[in-house]
Amino acid sequence: MPFRAVPGYFATYPNEDFQGLDSTKNNHLELINHKDWKELYDAIPRNTKNCHYKLLILSRHGQGYHNAAILRYGMGEWDAYWSLLSGDEHGEWLDSKLTPLGKDQVRRTGSNVLLPMVKQLGMLPHVFFSSPMRRCLETFIESWTPVLAETQEVPAGTNISIRIIEGLRETLGSHLCDKRVAHSMAVDEYQDFNTESGCIVHWQYAPDYPEDDELWLPDHRETCAEMDKRTLNGLFELFNQLSNEEKFISLTCHSGVIQSVLRNLQHPPIYNLDTGKVVAIVVEVPVNTADRGRL
């Protein structure tokens, strides 16, 4: 694997032999060898001529209408029937938006997790990335709004740019919740969103970003191996955009993406990660990543 998680920072990966943990029974963000985020950040290895090191924050989106439907109907009925529809009487889940509970979840994550992290580090992430799905765009807005409001170095009118990576999406195919709406619709709904503190959220798409979803297929559900390959290509795209100095990185994405990232980074599994939760990883990135191309 070209990228590698570095152990010894968080409860999710204390040592090389660790077999994983259940996030419902453990504080998976616990700092195991450092008193706070600043001390942890300062302990991340310095860049060398061969490797760079990044603090990667992976935020799972809050509860979407599809997540609520899974709780309502059960996974068996969801997979067999409801996932193939675009919604029910409780809401639509084609490229699902967040439920009111989902918005509340990620607001609390912003106030209770991201804000203390940013305050202790004394800075916002150097670069923000996101999945293109609407539940992730809404999660970024709702979770980072309270952080931006409390960050004096970010005055009203500041543009906050988030780079969209099309490949870092949830498992593709069959389930309509994972089909992206037209690009123009998402832009109309979310581009240049004004936060409560007056910051402007700007989504940065590739110049040739497709209007329609070219990845999702109605008759094939992506396998784990297929997703891991796609996710690895997404990680290449992400890390290739970073300079040496851009070390603190945020990605708003999905449970499936997070699990795939963990596998690609040779990181122990994190079980039962709830909607709206955050995972942090120190990542070793080879300097010649850009020369390796896509897989």
Role assignments for model-derived ranges:
Residues 1-160, 164, 173, 224-231:
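Active-site-proximal alpha-helix that buttresses catalytic centers in soluble enzyme cores
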Residues 51-59, 129, 246-257, 261:
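Beta-strand elements within well-structured catalytic alpha/beta cores of enzymes
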Residues 163, 168-169, 179-218:
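Histidine/lysine/aspartate-rich catalytic loop segments that bind and position anionic ligands
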Residues 227-244:
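A short, acidic, amphipathic alpha-helical segment used as a generic capping/interface helix at domain edges
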Residues 142, 260, 264:
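Active-site signature of alpha/beta-hydrolase-fold catalytic machinery across serine-
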